[in-house]
């Protein structure tokens, strides 16, 4: 671990020679605003010493070089929507905001790609593509507030991953500022490339520890003109999970297959003031999206999907409107009705292990003093396990949560799973990554980090500790 220096007046003065003074913030209100991301547990909060808001890659490079000169840690922050403490300045130092890098530079309709700065909201990326009858397939639930650079940094997933893959599958190229302060372009808008190491893919998912993503080149594709959102309602969670392989084997190729257990259904309907949600008392929701380029194909696949769900035990199959999707997107926010502090895990397992994994979680949590909610991207094996602190003491919450998480991760790894499908590791899961990752793999990751960032300046304490 590096021995960092404190932020000094001299350091602040040099920052103000790199950036306009108004974009170098040391006032108490600003520092307090950026002491956390979506983390609600105040014990995890940490004040930065200074917040900077650069305008371009060159200014970012200057800040990085200065941090190396003074041995001051630097944490990059996008939209602040993460829930694993990845944008919290655990070591103090600098928090660097990407919000001024907010331009879409190019949308190439012939080449089917878009070039954008890293601070553009994901929703604006999607809208720009849609305006040209094109699709950017990345679609995390926080798309209205997260930034595209943060999506790359965590390799974000979302509701369309079952068909289109995760963020790394949507990226041709990135521009980064390295831990040395160099500006480097990695990748190119090519359909295939066998030319040296695939460095852009190494940066994607590295959570700001190997470089600061400043610009992205994203893959686009034709937008399917025909679409249906279906809501299949079950009473048995195993029956609900069981439709996934059948939908895939039938060749339906759904865009989304989303799962909400009944506690989520009840809490989100209350949170959104939607008392008329279907089967609110006992329904388990599976939301299925089908998109096609042909209306007859859509009708055929919709009928197939409905038949599969009914044969699997669905008590109702309906068309899902935006209120149902709003319920799905607000699963995390809605638990604020019952607990100020909660934690969301996003363990991922092979799709054929989903049913057993959920059964194991339901059985295991019965030993613990907190309520459970599960929502999931069941089409790609990614579960969101939401646990609420309620009135537990800090000590009891920490102890019981640690024991439960250890049990769940042990089971997941024994069945081919991993700690995170899309949220990343941050500092919250770093000790678990060190505990469960095979020693050879962990050592290789540490060697890469040390080679790229010998002073451990960028986002220290995230992913793993040095």
Go through the PLM ranges and name each one.
Residues 1-65, 82-112, 264-275, 320-343, ...:
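N-terminal flexible segment immediately upstream of the FAD-binding catalytic core
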Residues 15, 67, 119, 181, ...:
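Residue-level signal for inorganic ion chemistry
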Residues 20-21, 413-425, 454-458:
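Alpha-helix capping/hinge segments and adjacent helical runs
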Residues 26-36, 233, 241-407, 411, ...:
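C-terminal substrate-recognition/cap domain of FAD-linked oxidoreductases
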Residues 67, 208, 453:
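Conserved, mostly hydrophobic/aromatic
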Residues 103-258, 458:
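FAD-binding subdomain of flavoenzyme oxidoreductases
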Residues 182, 430-466:
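Activity-critical C-terminal alpha-helical subdomain
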């Amino acid at each position: 671990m590096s021995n960092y220096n404190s932020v000094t007046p001299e350091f602040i003065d040099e920052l103000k020679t790199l950036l306009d003074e108004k974009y170098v913030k040391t006032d108490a209100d600003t520092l307090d605003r950026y002491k956390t991301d979506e983390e609600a547990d105040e014990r995890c909060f940490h004040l930065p010493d200074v917040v900077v808001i650069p305008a371009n890659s060159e200014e970012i490079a200057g800040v990085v070089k200065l941090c190396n000169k003074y041995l001051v840690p630097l944490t990059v922050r996008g939209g602040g929507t993460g829930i694993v403490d990845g944008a919290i300045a655990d070591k103090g130092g600098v928090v660097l905001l990407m919000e001024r890098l907010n331009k879409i530079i190019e949308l190439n309709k012939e080449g089917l790609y878009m070039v954008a700065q890293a601070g553009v909201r994901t929703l604006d990326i999607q809208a720009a593509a849609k305006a040209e009858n094109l699709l950017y397939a990345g679609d995390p639930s926080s798309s209205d507030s997260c930034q595209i650079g943060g999506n790359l940094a965590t390799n974000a997933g979302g509701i369309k991953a079952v068909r289109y893959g995760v963020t790394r599958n949507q990226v041709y190229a990135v521009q980064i500022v390295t831990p040395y302060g160099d500006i480097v372009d990695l990748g190119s808008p090519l359909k295939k490339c066998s030319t040296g190491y695939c460095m852009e893919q190494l940066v994607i998912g590295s959570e700001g520890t190997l470089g600061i993503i400043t610009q992205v080149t994203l893959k686009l594709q034709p937008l399917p003109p025909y679409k249906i959102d279906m809501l299949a309602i079950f009473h048995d969670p195993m029956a609900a999970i069981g439709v996934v392989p059948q939908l895939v084997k039938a060749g339906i190729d759904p865009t989304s297959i989303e799962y909400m257990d009944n506690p989520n259904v009840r809490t989100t309907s209350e949170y959104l003031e939607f008392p008329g949600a279907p089967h609110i008392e006992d329904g388990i929701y599976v939301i299925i999206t089908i998109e096609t380029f042909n209306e007859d194909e859509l009708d055929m696949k919709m009928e197939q999907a409905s038949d599969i769900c009914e044969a699997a035990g669905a008590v109702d199959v309906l068309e899902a409107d935006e209120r149902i999707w709003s319920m799905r997107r607000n699963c995390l926010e809605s638990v604020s009705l019952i607990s100020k502090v909660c934690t969301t895990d996003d363990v991922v397992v092979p799709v054929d292990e989903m049913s057993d994994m959920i059964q194991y979680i339901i059985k295991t949590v019965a030993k613990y003093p907190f309520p459970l909610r599960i929502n999931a991207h069941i089409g790609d094996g990614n579960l969101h396990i939401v646990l609420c602190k309620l009135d537990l003491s800090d000590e009891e919450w920490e102890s019981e949560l640690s024991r439960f998480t250890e049990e769940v991760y042990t089971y997941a790894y024994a069945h081919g799973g991993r700690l995170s499908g899309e949220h990343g590791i941050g500092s919250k899961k770093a000790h678990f990554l060190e505990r469960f990752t095979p020693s050879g793999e962990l050592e290789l990751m540490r060697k890469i980090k040390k080679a790229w960032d010998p002073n451990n300046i960028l986002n220290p304490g995230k992913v793993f500790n040095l």
